[in-house]
Amino acid sequence: MHKVLAIETSCDETSVSIVSNIGDTFRIHSNIIASQIEDHSKWGGVVPELAARKHLELLPFVLEKALEQAKIKIEEVDYIASTVAPGLVGCLRVGSITARSLCMLHSKPFLGIHHLEGHLSSILFSENYPKKSFLTLLVSGGHTELIKVDDNRGMQRLGKSFDDAAGEAFDKVGRLLGLGYPGGPAIEKIAKNGDPMKFNLPKCRISDKKGGFLKYDFSFSGLKTAVLRLVERINLAGKTVPIPDIAASFERVVAEVLVERTIKCAEDHRLDNVVVVGGVAANNTLRKMMISEASKKSIKVHLAPLDLCTDNAAMIGAAALFRIKFKDHLSNLKLGVAGRLSIEQANTLYEENPPF
């Protein structure tokens, strides 16, 4: 059994977790998350400099709490891991420097983890997670991607958003409707009282230079603009804006786009397992629609546990355990952080000469 202490500080959650595995069974001993939502809500979104300062303030307490809850001393940990890319650079540095300092202080091996690989690994804490190749829909505030994971756990991105990620669109529409930040939970809550078929909002596509459209890619900027124009027309007509109906219609269209393109991609690549992870994966409309539509195509859906959909250190620990178990990977202590790094470049984090 390997025990990993993992740190996640890529955006606005400060998280430390202790995880372990015995064979194919992964266990969470502690997963402490300190959210900064209240600090950023007044600004309508995450302020990078403020987020980094809050990580500095919160991380010592969160680390102590994680060790205490797991009933373990840091000397008993086998590996230490932290998110190193992609994310807000100042925030990533706080977690990375802390992790590498602990490694040097306690003579522990270090693993730098790709944030998206962490989200993909959150499914390892679910029962009967897929052991063979599968398609992952990663849908969060910063990313909307379709990633194929093969039998050897190699990763290939098959689809992506060309502008706003789905979670980003939720946040922007939430602000537009006066629902505050973060928009996802607020829209989902008020949409329960609305008619999802009230407004016919667009399902935007990306044109293919060869003709037609890119089958697996996403665009949510146009949908956001359509909601803005709808609200403007209603206001100009002197009518009351039906916020629940708009929220429900918006939520439905986002879910339909995600589900339709995910299932199309899975069918085309002959993948009969679909994994859904990331913050937006907590949306109940999306979860129900994905299961319902996939079942019609004999595709099995694996959903990330609700408490592991948003950013957390347990998923980073799971990614580290997976790297140790199947790849025997470790990172150089000189490895830095990067604001951008594609999922296909994740293996570079374990090269003798760090990429950054």
UniProtKB/Swiss-Prot annotation:
Cellular localisation: Cytoplasm
The EC number(s) this enzyme carries: 2.3.1.234
The protein's required cofactors: Fe(2+)
GO terms, biological process: tRNA threonylcarbamoyladenosine modification
Keyword tRNA processing: yes
Catalytic activity: L-threonylcarbamoyladenylate + adenosine(37) in tRNA = N(6)-L-threonylcarbamoyladenosine(37) in tRNA + AMP + H(+)
InterPro entries: ATPase_NBD (IPR043129), Gcp-like_dom (IPR000905), KAE1/TsaD (IPR017861), TsaD (IPR022450)
Cellular component, GO, one term: cytoplasm
GO molecular function: iron ion binding; N(6)-L-threonylcarbamoyladenine synthase activity
Keywords: Acyltransferase, Cytoplasm, Iron, Metal-binding, Transferase, tRNA processing
First-level EC class: transferase
Transmembrane segments: none
Binding annotation for Fe cation: H115, H119, D311
Cofactor annotation remark: Binds 1 Fe(2+) ion per subunit.
Binding site for substrate: L138, V139, S140, G141, G142, D171, G184, N283
Entry-linked Pfam families: TsaD (PF00814)
General function of this protein: Required for the formation of a threonylcarbamoyl group on adenosine at position 37 (t(6)A37) in tRNAs that read codons beginning with adenine. Is involved in the transfer of the threonylcarbamoyl moiety of threonylcarbamoyl-AMP (TC-AMP) to the N6 group of A37, together with TsaE and TsaB. TsaD likely plays a direct catalytic role in this reaction.
Family as reported in the entry's similarity comment: Belongs to the KAE1 / TsaD family.
Protein name: tRNA N6-adenosine threonylcarbamoyltransferase
Species this chain originates from: Prochlorococcus marinus (strain MIT 9301)
Gene name in the database record: tsaD
